[in-house]
């Protein structure tokens, strides 16, 4: 990014970077004139597997990617603190943020009608997910990609029942976003792991059980931001038809 311009007001990532070092460099293009600027990062579950296939051959590629994913999915800690900690800067504290990041802003405004931060004990859900992966590999001789695993979890009655209890949703079906967050969290904490299959034309990422993790009773609590409002979503069919009703707004 050869941008020699001091008054950049926005840096927008439509996808995650491969590492926090890269993201720090790229977002650092904003606000070099000492005035405030916004850095917006758009993250989705498929980014993890797309980027993992790109960095799988690098010695520290996956470890650095997991740091980046942890930054993206953390709903609680200060964003700047996460960057500083992972880059070895111990001088920065959350108080220095001054509510500049979304997590610090959320805690300062305390809008409980919009979202609630909860800590989830995932032992039972992790066991059910591992059993699902084991059953698929044993009975169907099938390896599961990340998106396919989410599809299976949303259709599995046992996993749905466990998730409803964890989220205190007795009747409402848990959203796909919850399972995506859970699998991402399990991968970066190595409760599950990625298995790569190399072809002449591509690298395919599969999610498999981590046999090195035997004791599921002492896993960390998973922080999750539970939305208290029904989000409005635009859905596109399999042919990815263009939505013509969307109004175009001129920001200039």
Language-model segments: residues:
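Short, amphipathic alpha-helical interaction segments positioned at domain boundaries
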Residues: 51, 56, 208-238
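Short linear regulatory motifs embedded in intrinsically disordered, acidic Ser/Thr-rich regions
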Residues: 242-251
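Minor-groove-contacting beta-hairpin "wing" of winged helix-turn-helix DNA-binding domains
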Residues: 41, 199-209
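Short intrinsically disordered, low-complexity coil segments enriched in acidic
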Residues: 1-4, 221-222
């Amino acid at each position: 990014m050869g941008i020699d311009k001091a008054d950049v007001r926005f840096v927008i990532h439509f996808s995650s970077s491969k590492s926090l070092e890269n993201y720090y460099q790229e977002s650092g293009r904003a606000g070099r004139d000492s005035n405030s600027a916004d850095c917006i990062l758009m993250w989705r579950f498929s980014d993890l597997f797309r980027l993992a296939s790109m960095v799988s051959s690098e010695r520290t590629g996956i470890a650095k990617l997991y740091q980046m994913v942890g930054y993206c999915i953390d709903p609680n800690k200060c964003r700047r603190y996460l960057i500083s900690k992972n880059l070895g800067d111990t001088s920065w504290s959350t108080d220095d943020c001054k509510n500049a990041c979304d997590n610090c802003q959320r805690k300062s405004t305390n809008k409980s009608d919009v979202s609630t931060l909860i800590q989830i004990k995932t032992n039972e859900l992790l066991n059910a997910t591992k059993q699902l992966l084991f059953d698929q590999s044993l009975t169907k001789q099938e390896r599961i990609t990340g998106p396919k695993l989410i599809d299976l979890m949303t259709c599995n009655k046992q996993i749905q029942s466990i998730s409803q209890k964890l989220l205190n949703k007795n009747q409402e079906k848990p959203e796909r976003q919850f399972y995506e967050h859970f699998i991402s969290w399990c991968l970066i904490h190595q409760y599950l792991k990625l298995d790569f299959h190399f072809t002449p034309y591509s690298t395919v990422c599969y999610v498999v059980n981590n046999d090195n993790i035997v004791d599921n009773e002492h896993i960390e609590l998973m922080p999750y931001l539970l939305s208290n409002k029904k989000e409005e979503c635009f859905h596109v069919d399999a042919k990815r038809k263009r939505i013509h009703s969307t109004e175009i707004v001129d920001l200039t």
